[in-house]
């Protein structure tokens, strides 16, 4: 289970550029849940993922994953617990290394052992099988550098890499936004399969209302650094994109400060 309790994040604290990115955010997610996250730009979506990954340490509140308080543990300390796939396909892998070497690094994430153990004969066979399952023909290119691949191929491999270290939590930060429609559809189908196979607790940030409804079993909306909409079960079932957009607009209307409040 993931618990975010009264999370506050302030960037540039005490400076003229001070900005509150999260403000008393509360969110509880059951093990194995697949939650889609929507919200306007600046709502705090990526910051929330950063707090879960350990990239961003909250100025207030508590973060619990699997019953462990990880609030002050950084990214390296959470590497075995949390995997993340970013919007930019180039971010999640090293272009100068081969496909096989990238997979080996991912498998060794959070462990003290180096690449030697991760590149054993048994591991190599496993890597090849995992890549072959993508049906992209990359199993015959395991020695190719990652920077020779397309963005979609790299993103598909980033998803596979996210499953290799036994992480409990998968964070997806608009991971199809930079892909063409066909590849985005392929990556989402792959996402659904891997999440189900590995029973990953998943948070997926997306600007696509269609994706927000088609995937997962719960949708939350952030605005002003807080959760302002949370729909699941019967309340979510049957919602159309138009319904969700209307709910989105209503939340913005009723949670945005008035001109008078802004002046104060």
What are these regions (language model features)?
Residues 61-69, 229-231:
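Conserved ABC transporter NBD signature motif
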């Amino acid at each position: 289970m993931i618990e975010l309790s009264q999370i506050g994040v302030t960037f540039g604290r005490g400076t003229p550029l001070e900005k509150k990115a999260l403000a008393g955010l509360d969110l509880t997610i059951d093990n194995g849940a697949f939650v889609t996250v929507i919200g306007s730009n600046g709502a705090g979506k990526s910051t929330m993922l950063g707090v879960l990954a350990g990239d961003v340490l909250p100025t207030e509140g508590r973060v619990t994953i699997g019953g462990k308080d990880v609030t002050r543990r950084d990214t390296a300390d959470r590497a075995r617990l949390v995997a993340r796939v970013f919007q930019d396909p180039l971010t999640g892998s090293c272009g100068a290394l081969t496909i096989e070497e990238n997979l080996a690094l991912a498998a060794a994430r959070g462990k003290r052992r180096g690449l030697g153990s991760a590149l054993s004969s048994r591991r190599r066979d496993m890597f090849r099988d995992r890549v072959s399952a993508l049906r992209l023909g990359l199993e015959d290119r395991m020695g190719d550098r990652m920077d020779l691949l397309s963005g979609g191929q790299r993103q598909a491999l980033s998803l596979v890499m996210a499953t290799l270290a036994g992480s409990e939590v998968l964070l997806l930060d608009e991971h199809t936004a930079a892909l063409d429609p066909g590849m985005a559809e392929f990556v989402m189908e792959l996402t659904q399969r891997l999440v189900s196979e590995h029973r990953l607790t998943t948070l997926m940030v997306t600007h696509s209302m269609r994706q927000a409804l088609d995937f997962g079993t719960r949708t939350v909306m952030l605005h002003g650094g807080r959760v302002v909409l949370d729909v699941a079960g019967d309340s979510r079932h049957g919602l159309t994109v138009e319904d969700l957009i209307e709910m989105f607009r209503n939340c913005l209307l009723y949670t945005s400060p008035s001109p008078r409040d802004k002046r104060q």
